[in-house]
């Protein structure tokens, strides 16, 4: 799901396989390599382990590729 909340800010929502706190330092490192991400957070209490990203550009492909490359499942949730 990709929603623009202002001219320069996208909200991207992903289903992931990331379930554990121990993964967070690695996820932080992976996401820090993607330019334009302003904020991100997880809802691991949701069955889909939701990753929510606020970014200056639509970085969906980069996020999916980076997480998949590091062994995590990641798929964008569509509107």
What are these model-predicted stretches?
Residues 1, 32-39:
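Short amphipathic beta-strand starts and helix->beta connectors
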Residues 2-20:
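Short glycine-/aliphatic-rich beta-strand segments at the starts of folded cytosolic domains
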Residues 5-6, 43-45:
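Short, ordered beta-strand-loop transition motifs
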Residues 17-35:
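Short amphipathic alpha-helix segments
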Residues 26-31, 62-71:
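Short amphipathic alpha-helices in soluble, non-transmembrane regions
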Residues 41-42, 71-79:
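Conserved short beta-strand edge segments in small beta-sheet-based binding/regulatory domains
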Residues 46-50:
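Surface-exposed aromatic
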Residues 55-60:
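Helix N-cap motif at beta-to-alpha junctions
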């Amino acid at each position: 799901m990709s929603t623009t909340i202002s001219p320069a800010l996208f909200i991207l929502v992903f289903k992931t396989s990331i379930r554990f706190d121990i993964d967070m330092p690695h996820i932080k490192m992976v996401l820090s390599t993607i330019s334009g991400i302003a904020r991100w957070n997880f809802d691991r209490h949701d069955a889909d382990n939701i990753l929510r990203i606020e970014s200056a550009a639509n970085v969906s492909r980069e996020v999916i590729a980076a997480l998949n490359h590091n062994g995590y499942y990641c798929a964008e949730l569509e509107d």
